[in-house]
Amino acid sequence: MPNITWCDLPEDVSLWPGLPLSLSGDEVMPLDYHAGRSGWLLYGRGLDKQRLTQYQSKLGAAMVIVAAWCVEDYQVIRLAGSLTARATRLAHEAQLDVAPLGKIPHLRTPGLLVMDMDSTAIQIECIDEIAKLAGTGEMVAEVTERAMRGELDFTASLRSRVATLKGADANILQQVRENLPLMPGLTQLVLKLETLGWKVAIASGGFTFFAEYLRDKLRLTAVVANELEIMDGKFTGNVIGDIVDAQYKAKTLTRLAQEYEIPLAQTVAIGDGANDLPMIKAAGLGIAYHAKPKVNEKAEVTIRHADLMGVFCILSGSLNQK
């Protein structure tokens, strides 16, 4: 292998020759390195030579770059060693994301992704938008925020929020659905996973009216959510049947895995609220997505900056192991 200098390296990290190599400032050293399933990922948009060397300089230690590749407009870099708290903090300060490699399911083996819906698969909390149109928006939004932070019992808080809708016109549901903003990256993520033989489902503490719409639009494998009771075109203020709470979500993941004969090691769960934590912990890979502080603290893997294609960036690490 001829000597490689920092100046020889192109701006596009995925085109770097001589990987694996050690990067320390302007010093570049090709290595004979075989890491197996160990190491960690650093990824983000615009992660070029300059940003990577700036990151390494702040880290204050040499980085062993095992592989680099692109996932659509994201650059993904696989690094040797252990992901430290300092490396994580500096990545977030640089608007980049990280993930340890150890428990990543294999992308080319059939798997299962179970997503939360509100503020994960879509950009809004549906109950808040319904309540705005019903005239109880401010009160309901405050309760929703506290429930997602884990400060309130989810079931009791959901029932209290739904009760404020009593007597409101159920056509509100259609109004909200007509303007339902999908989370960036959702459609691409679902299409890519389904092409690879994965099952994708939603387990939501929100409502069936929206979850079933997403199921049909994206051809999802399954959805579970809460059903609002409607009589004579009006909300009764009640929810029909069992509440989809934190434990229900976790049981949905394990049930679907059993139903489709998918090992738990090949499952992924993603969500943003405290009621997603049991599901996140039950999965082979649990991801907190733009989550509340309590959820970020308790999840081993978080996505702070990327959109939902960040999930695919993480899973792509299973394809780039030497």
Swiss-Prot record:
Keywords carried by this UniProt record: Amino-acid biosynthesis, Hydrolase, Magnesium, Metal-binding, Serine biosynthesis
Keyword RNA-binding: no
A single GO molecular function term of this UniProt record: L-phosphoserine phosphatase activity
EC number: 3.1.3.3
InterPro entries hit by this protein: HAD-like_SerB, HAD-like_sf, HAD_sf, PSP, SerB_N
GO biological process: amino acid biosynthetic process; L-serine biosynthetic process
Gene3D superfamilies cross-referenced by the UniProt entry: 3.30.70.2020, HAD superfamily/HAD-like, Phosphoserine phosphatase, domain 2
Active-site residues per Swiss-Prot or TrEMBL entry: D116, D118
Binding residues annotated for Mg(2+), in chain numbering: D12, D116, D118, D272
Binding site for substrate: P10, E11, D12, E125, R161, S204, G205, K249, N275
CDD domains (alphabetical): HAD_PSP (cd07500)
pH effects: Optimum pH is between 6 and 7.5.
Pathway: Amino-acid biosynthesis; L-serine biosynthesis; L-serine from 3-phospho-D-glycerate: step 3/3
Family: Belongs to the HAD-like hydrolase superfamily. SerB family.
Task performed by this protein: Catalyzes the dephosphorylation of phosphoserine (P-Ser). Also catalyzes the hydrolysis of phosphothreonine (P-Thr).
Protein name: Phosphoserine phosphatase
UniProt source species: Escherichia coli (strain K12)
Lineage: Bacteria, Pseudomonadati, Pseudomonadota, Gammaproteobacteria, Enterobacterales
